[in-house]
Amino acid sequence: MAAGAAEAAEAAVAVVEVGSARQFEELLRLKTKSLLVVHFWAPWAPQCVQMNDVMAELAKEHPHVSFVKLEAEAVPEVSEKYEISSVPTFLFFKNSQKVDRLDGAHAPELTKKVQRHVSSGSFPPSTNEHVKEDLNLRLKKLTHAAPCMLFMKGTPQEPRCGFSKQMVEILHKHNIQFSSFDIFSDEEVRQGLKTYSNWPTYPQLYVSGELIGGLDIIKELEASEELDTICPKAPKLEERLKVLTNKASVMLFMKGNKQEAKCGFSKQILEILNSTGVEYETFDILEDEEVRQGLKTFSNWPTYPQLYVRGDLVGGLDIVKELKDNGELLPILKGEN
């Protein structure tokens, strides 16, 4: 009990709560030398409460990063200034300037962004030659981070220049699977990549680590119908859902995972499955909005959790409870029915 109270107190200290525009501006001024992560949240939104917990964990892992939560509706002047239209929204600041943004409850993406900004701002002092060598290695890793990498201004969800927006639209139109890097989030990468690839402008598209070009080149490739042969295609959602539902003999789509259910219904179904002794795998729908929405249509089942056996939907919690009470659950899980 005492240990739990101590952990809660530690998390409370690690995440600062801001209640006024003046306090926020003062914090921006004081935290110029460190990364500042601000969560615009609302107490009535359960996903915000969940992301506060995620942020508290990140605060323990990154003691040199300043984590702040700000109730969006309580400080409207700050929310309006930064165009906060929904919660949760996260803003990232360095040197009092906004360098990145994340909209929505995406815990893995928040963790990735924090780690990226921390690593980008913590190069040890060394000679110019060593710094250049380290940067080139980093750029090589970044350009190879995915089969198709787009270096752009902003994110695919929120492009911050017309050329980047057009590039994203072309890639989406051709169903091309790509990852992106926001050059506004890292000035060193932004300047270094120009020299590394001898290409002075953004956006820049890479396939297998090789520069394809900027927007004009991509438009030319689209016009000549070569783009589809160069860039990797994203699997269609229906195909992806078929693969996911057949990933294991017994698949549970839930909020959270085996170790940590993030809703009461998911927790109950885990307890039932664990009591059967049957092996199963899980998929956290909170980490993938496309799967979360797509599976509802794919299986014509509007709620979660959803249990599948050999790719076929068994049902949600109520169905699983009925099957257990009737003694039918175990044979179904074992594929005997």
From Swiss-Prot:
Pfam families the UniProt entry points to: Glutaredoxin (PF00462), Thioredoxin (PF00085)
Compartments, as annotated in UniProt: Cytoplasm, Cytosol; Cytoplasm, Cell cortex; Cytoplasm, Myofibril, Sarcomere, Z line
Binding site for [2Fe-2S] cluster: 161, 263
Expression induction: In neonatal cardiomyocytes after exposure to the hypertrophic agonists EDN1 (ET-1) or phenylephrine (PE). In transverse aortic constriction (TAC) induced cardiac hypertrophy in adult hearts.
Modified residues (Phosphoserine): 119, 122
Cellular component GO terms held in the UniProt record: cell cortex; cytosol; dendrite; iron-sulfur cluster assembly complex; nucleus; Z disc
Superkingdom as given in the UniProt entry: Eukaryota
Domain Glutaredoxin: 144-238, 239-337
Bilayer-crossing regions: none
SUPFAM superfamilies per UniProt: Thioredoxin-like
Main location as per UniProt: cytoplasm
Gene Ontology terms, MF aspect: identical protein binding; iron-sulfur cluster binding; metal ion binding; protein kinase C binding
Keywords: Acetylation, Cytoplasm, Iron, Iron-sulfur, Metal-binding, Phosphoprotein, Repeat
InterPro entries: Glutaredoxin, GRX_PICOT-like, Monothiol_GRX-rel, Thioredoxin-like_sf, Thioredoxin_domain
GO terms under biological process: [2Fe-2S] cluster assembly; cell redox homeostasis; intracellular iron ion homeostasis; iron-sulfur cluster assembly; negative regulation of cardiac muscle hypertrophy; regulation of the force of heart contraction
Domain notes from UniProt: The thioredoxin domain lacks the two redox-active cysteines. This strongly suggests that it lacks thioredoxin activity.
Role noted for this protein: Together with BOLA2, acts as a cytosolic iron-sulfur (Fe-S) cluster assembly factor that facilitates [2Fe-2S] cluster insertion into a subset of cytosolic proteins. Acts as a critical negative regulator of cardiac hypertrophy and a positive inotropic regulator. Required for hemoglobin maturation. Does not possess any thyoredoxin activity since it lacks the conserved motif that is essential for catalytic activity.
Subunit structure: Homodimer; the homodimer is independent of 2Fe-2S clusters. Heterotrimer; forms a heterotrimeric complex composed by two BOLA2 molecules and one GLRX3 molecule; linked by [2Fe-2S] clusters. Interacts (via N-terminus) with PRKCQ/PKC-theta. Interacts (via C-terminus) with CSRP3. Interacts with CSRP2.
Protein name, entry field: Glutaredoxin-3
Organism: Rattus norvegicus
Phylogenetic classification of the source organism: Eukaryota, Metazoa, Chordata, Craniata, Vertebrata
